Curated annotation (Swiss-Prot):
Keywords: Ribonucleoprotein, Ribosomal protein, RNA-binding, rRNA-binding. Belongs to the universal ribosomal protein uS14 family. The gene is rpsN. One of its GO terms (molecular function) is rRNA binding. GO terms for biological process: translation. It holds the Pfam family Ribosomal_S14. It comes from Cronobacter sakazakii (strain ATCC BAA-894). PANTHER family: 30S RIBOSOMAL PROTEIN S14, SMALL RIBOSOMAL SUBUNIT PROTEIN US14M. This is Small ribosomal subunit protein uS14.
Amino acid sequence: MAKQSMKAREVKRVALAEKYFAKRAELKAIISDVNASDEDRWNAVLKLQTLPRDSSPSRQRNRCRQTGRPHAFLRKFGLSRIKVREAAMRGEIPGLKKASW
């Protein structure tokens, strides 16, 4: 189980990313615009740097919904491999069965 503080930190990162998404997209558009002046582009870079670090979506980590485990996360289920296996063995995931050949 992940610490509660780590889970809370991830929730905070998701909220910050949503809050600053439009502002970040606007600044990135200015930075990548070749027709914008160098001064405008540089000012956009400086403004982007003043935004909170955790507002960047790349700072988010996928975690298991049940345990908060950050490694071996399966996106399709939103769970770690361990919890997917446990749920599959109990028959809780429709259409998923143990491989046999």
